[in-house]
């Protein structure tokens, strides 16, 4: 026998031995309940965001996730670099000294993720009876306003005239959101069937890039068929655009406006149809109410922030990159000033002004709000605080604001003027550098950039 054959044989035996030592075993409902508060056990929901957040799984009478469960979606496996896998899992609380209990209603996904972790040396059990668990009188948790973030499957059902959970309307419009008129809207070249284009200029204007006047916004909305009583679903290639417009529509008075989590990529991955033809909305005569209906969610200019700080102790939360926050760069070629409003707290962000990477999962869906809340706690940002999120011009700030709305937090706002408005007048106090020379806080979200194929015992 050649040395190569011996090496291959020994390697195969080693892999078999590893898989034998890390067999995946099933856990019963009784055993799960017995260990639900056991610190040596970790329960992990591997389903898509909408199901974890609160939507009902197929054939389930209740929605949400098992009490105390964290989230690690099976689809993430395709986006986590091999050299980051264990550190990323550790950041989620998954370690080899714990018994990891995975559950999912999709047994193929459950097998994939459980064998992947077992092959890497984790102690793994699987819970295959989640639907019966959900239909029994066992504890489930969900987010207060989980319906704000919808899945491709939910939207597809609504488009086809069905009544998916929480949807009671018969008037639906879907918009791809990006800057520019149709001829400049590259993200609209391929879009969800029936979707329209929403130009972000319809709700904001230079030089501050704050919300336009109520009259201008009303004219743009009715010209594009948007009324207060229609269900509006928004998506964008860059999540910031859709969530910026969602905040603006909620400010205006649209009662049911939602975000397609995962955008067009998630839609295509779900094998749902797209088209290239241009759809033009039919104008309407009236928005249906006076704009704005919810002015309180907007702190427009620096003076509004200062007033709120004096009245209720408002905390100003920066969602600008660390280099912007510490005054190394302004972040924009049209914003000359560097620094932050005095007293601003860093609320995590992204690599530059175009993204909010700390808030995204490996598959580019929104990160679990519970993880973000834990990061905020380290920064002194808490549920009962009055919080105004801001960035340069309001786009990035819409993401954390949206998450607080999902969680049912009451006193959260977007400071629309952001750093751009603040730095325009030298009378407003500015801080530069990291407060107290603090180091950049860890977002615990480094999954690398290399796609992986998997390394499990599953054949």
Question: What residue ranges belong to the model's regions?
Answer:
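Gram-negative bacterial Sec-dependent N-terminal signal peptides
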Residues: 1-20
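Cytosolic catalytic domains that perform sulfur/thiol-centered chemistry
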Residues: 19-459
